[in-house]
Amino acid sequence: MADTNVASELNANVWKIEVAPGDQVGEDDTLIILESMKMEIPIVAPKAGTVKSISVNEGDAVTEGQVLVVLA
């Protein structure tokens, strides 16, 4: 089963990370909350799986298409 990269949909700041490596997540579970122009944007799991890695920290600026989380 191939890993799934979960990327940012826009340029924003990482406001809150809701998961940790090793966590089991379900489809549509919130992984990360981004903040842009005072709006909170949830980034959700596209499928159920296990969080393999998180490549950002709270407070980081991210760009559209940047990989935030890898699910196994």
Give the location of each predicted region.
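Surface-exposed, flexible loop/turn segments at secondary-structure boundaries
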Residues: G22, M39, G59
